Design a protein with these regions (language model features):
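Mg2+-dependent endonuclease catalytic cores in nucleic-acid-processing enzymes, primarily RNase H-like
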Residues: 1-112, 159, 163-167
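Extracellular low-complexity, Gly/Ser/Thr-rich intrinsically disordered linkers
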Residues: 99-146
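Acidic two-metal-ion nuclease catalytic site recognized across multiple nuclease folds
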Residues: 114-115, 142-167
Length: 167
């Protein structure tokens, strides 16, 4: 599974790339900052024909519920001991990565008189590591949608097992 963010300057190129490689698991995604959205939502068709109708085999855009995933990840960053929910990092990961990973925070804002929590960047610091972590979580959910969860790791282990000598 490969997720490509389509929310930048090359949206149509991303759609074309994902369309041509959809059989290989490449999908176009776009972060949606709304409360209650699933980690990876139902795709919408984004390619239209000359009549303005969605093309049958056109590119699909998968929405990613970034607010919920960020809350989940920030909760998991608080785990100090390995176990369920703990995030593992290579020892070589430097402080710059963790600054990017924690470059946003949740603040309380009022919209139409009602309070809501929104994610905002702490400063002008980059947040690419956080975006990548959110999209990696979305890719995991795509795997859950496509494959039997119980067999994902079995398939992975079989594929990566060294060849056993025949007896």
């Amino acid at each position: 599974v490969c997720c490509i963010d389509s929310g930048g300057h090359h949206t149509q190129e991303v759609y074309g790339y994902a369309r041509e490689r959809s059989a290989m698991g490449v999908i176009a995604i776009k972060g949606m900052g709304q409360k209650g959205k699933p980690p990876l939502g139902k795709p919408s068709k984004v390619d239209i024909n000359f009549k303005g109708r969605a093309m049958k085999n056109g590119a699909q855009l998968f929405p990613v519920g970034v607010d919920g995933v960020k809350s989940l990840l920030f909760g998991r960053l608080k785990h100090n001991d390995p176990g369920p929910g703990y995030l593992h990092f290579y020892p070589t990961v430097g402080p710059d990565y963790f600054q990017e990973l924690t470059a946003e925070r949740q603040v309380l804002r009022y919209r139409n008189g009602f309070p809501e929590r929104v994610w905002v960047k702490k400063s002008q610091s980059p947040n690419e590591a956080l975006d990548e972590m959110v999209y990696a979580y979305a890719a995991l959910h795509r795997m859950y949608q496509k494959y039997d969860r119980r067999s994902i790791w079995d398939q992975f282990e079989r594929r990566n097992e060294p060849n056993k000598p025949s007896q």
